[in-house]
């Protein structure tokens, strides 16, 4: 099992992390997500097959663009074109009834079922847009992944798009309502930081964290461990991965468990779960002294 894990992580590092994620090759965002699916769950999956399906959609969208009367100086018209193709012709839709299902994080399943959550629908949206030379960037918005088109980076002139809501254009009012819906009564200000461009590392780590939460709920600790090690391969100093590795090791290696939890608190002394982690440390020390 350990050798199998090492092989998976080594493949992830060589074929995806070093090749695409670290250089932040956004044109490979779909391939990264598919490799993630293959390593964690669908070991026999043919990644090339799904890339060919994406490529076919890209070609169809490009043909649609060439036959249209779109004014390319007006980004909203290009957004309308992508929305028409993705949500009406291809019939991709938001999985509002089974949002927490871990399958929503696997791009191969989203391509097959035409249903997903904000982050996977955003990956498809970004990839389709690339085929018509419309460069979009991922946005790691709290609790709800978005994408954006940058008109003028220096002056923060941009268009925020929500692929989970059929490509709706989000103005500041809509964004504020969205964040208030997730954090009621906290009056979190809408800042430029919340809609910053995300890099490939942040996108893949967000998917992996989603999966970790799901695997923890269903007690699939082997899969949780794989996802956690995949995060470490991207970011060896990821504080939540350090904490979760400690939790995974708590029965196998309590001393290492304590070391990791202490490291987590050193890196995140103001963490929301700091009090809980301190109680765990105390209970482990009492148990093994």
Per-segment meaning from a language model:
Residues 1-289:
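A structural boundary/capping signal
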């Amino acid at each position: 099992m350990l050798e199998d894990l090492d092989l998976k992580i080594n493949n992830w590092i060589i074929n995806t992390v070093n090749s695409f994620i670290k250089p932040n090759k956004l044109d490979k965002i779909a391939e990264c997500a598919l490799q993630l699916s293959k390593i964690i769950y669908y070991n026999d999956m043919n990644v090339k097959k799904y890339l060919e399906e994406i490529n076919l959609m890209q070609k169809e969208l490009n043909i649609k663009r060439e036959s249209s009367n779109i004014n390319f100086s007006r980004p909203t018209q290009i957004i309308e074109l992508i929305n028409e193709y993705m949500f009406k012709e291809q019939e991709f839709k938001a999985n509002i009834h089974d949002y927490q299902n871990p399958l929503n994080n696997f791009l191969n399943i989203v391509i097959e079922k035409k249903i997903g959550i904000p982050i996977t629908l955003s990956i498809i949206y970004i990839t389709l847009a690339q085929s018509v030379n419309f460069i979009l960037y991922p946005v790691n918005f709290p609790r709800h992944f978005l994408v954006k088109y940058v008109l003028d980076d220096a002056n923060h002139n941009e268009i925020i798009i929500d692929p989970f809501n059929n490509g709706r254009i989000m103005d500041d009012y809509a964004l504020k309502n969205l964040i208030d819906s997730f954090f009621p009564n906290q009056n979190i200000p809408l800042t430029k930081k919340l809609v910053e461009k995300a890099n490939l590392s942040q996108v893949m780590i967000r998917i992996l964290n989603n999966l970790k939460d799901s695997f923890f709920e269903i007690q699939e600790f082997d899969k949780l461990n794989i996802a956690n090690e995949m995060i470490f391969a991207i970011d060896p100093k990821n504080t939540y991965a350090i904490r979760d590795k400690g939790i995974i090791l708590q029965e196998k290696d309590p001393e290492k468990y304590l070391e990791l939890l202490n490291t987590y608190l050193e890196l995140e002394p103001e963490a929301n779960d700091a009090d809980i982690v301190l109680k765990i440390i105390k209970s482990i020390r009492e148990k093994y002294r």
